[in-house]
Amino acid sequence: RLQPLESQTFWLSETPTVPGSKSWDAAITRIVTWAKFKDKKAGTTFFAFNTHFDHMGKVARRESAKLLLSRVREIAGDVPAVITGDFNSEPKDEPIQIITDKNNALHLEDTREICQTPHYGPSGTFNGFKSKERSDQPIDYIFINKKWNVLRHATISQTWEGRFASDHFAVLATLRL
């Protein structure tokens, strides 16, 4: 149903077009990978971005949030875009505040906050491979520009034979253009 039209990667650094670049106080190299898709059934196009912000660098997370906003606008323009990832930041933290700041024309919407139905599942998204979630706050998000309707939002916390698939719970949103 989805036809990939284009894809690229940029680095979360002061030189985002330089492969392997790392800046600010980042512990390791971090990226954003994006793709443009055509929905062959609906005839629409949209962009999907995925990222993983640094786990150590507070400055790196802040600057990555700013860079992400500017690059999403530069790449996607007014075309619908969904941005997913591990932002290593809780809702009250500066990177998420930057991303969702309604006073900034580039801001994105947190799908959990604007969903048409109540969120399903635990609030926290990091589990550390342990049976109890470590935090009651998310660090993994699905953001969108203003082109989508959010029908459902969930954090999926099931295990298989007592084992977690990841140290993070899956975050799911049902979106409609």
What kind of region is each of these model predictions?
Residues 32-36, 50, 141-142, 170-172:
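Conserved hydrophobic/aromatic beta-strand scaffold that supports enzyme active sites
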Residues 31-33, 64, 68:
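Internal, well-ordered alpha-helical segments in soluble enzyme and binding-protein domains
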Residues 45-47, 81:
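The start of beta-strands in P-loop NTPase/AAA+ ATPase cores
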Residues 1-45, 155:
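Structured beta-strand-rich core segments of catalytic domains in phosphoester-bond hydrolases
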Residues 51-53, 86-87, 169:
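Active-site metal-binding loops of divalent metal-dependent hydrolases
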Residues 2-7, 59, 63, 70-81, ...:
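Metal-dependent phosphoester-hydrolase catalytic domains
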Residues 36-39, 47-57:
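Conserved catalytic scaffold of divalent metal-dependent phosphoesterases
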